[in-house]
């Protein structure tokens, strides 16, 4: 417990909240260019080949972003829109690529949860 003299000398500092997606710089989304598209394996107990992309953002950051959905058309130099949101079983992946915008096409033949994958309504 500090004394009154100590509190006068230096006041209590408010707790600053640390952002979970610093590369977005406070924006809801950011545009970026893919520098590498590859797969990584999740941590235990899961097993898969998760599709990710290394993206250079307009904010100057180089980040790893997850590519959601089944199948994608992304390659090097593809321009993508990136949003926040981590992937729990992929350490270091704190961003998602938005499907159905810019160069990332929507998921084909998607019936449910279409808005999350940029899929058009089936005829």
Swiss-Prot record:
Source species of the chain: Glycine max
Principal cellular location given in the protein's record: plastid
Chain's role: With S4 and S5 plays an important role in translational accuracy. Located at the interface of the 30S and 50S subunits.
Keywords in alphabetical order: Chloroplast, Plastid, Ribonucleoprotein, Ribosomal protein, RNA-binding, rRNA-binding
Subunit note: Part of the 30S ribosomal subunit.
Annotated protein name in UniProt: Small ribosomal subunit protein uS12cz/uS12cy
Subcellular location: Plastid, Chloroplast
Biological process annotations from GO: translation
């Amino acid at each position: 417990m500090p004394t009154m003299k100590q509190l006068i000398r230096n006041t209590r500092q408010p707790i600053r909240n640390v952002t979970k997606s610093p590369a977005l710089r406070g924006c809801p989304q950011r545009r970026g260019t893919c520098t590498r598209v590859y797969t990584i394996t999740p941590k235990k107990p899961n097993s898969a080949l998760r599709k990710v992309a290394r993206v250079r953002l307009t904010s100057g950051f180089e980040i790893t972003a997850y590519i959601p959905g089944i199948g994608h058309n992304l390659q090097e130099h593809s321009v993508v829109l990136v949003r926040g949101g981590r992937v729990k079983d992929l350490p270091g992946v704190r961003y998602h690529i938005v499907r159905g915008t810019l160069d990332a096409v929507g998921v084909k033949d998607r019936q449910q949860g279409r808005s999350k994958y940029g899929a058009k309504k089936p005829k």
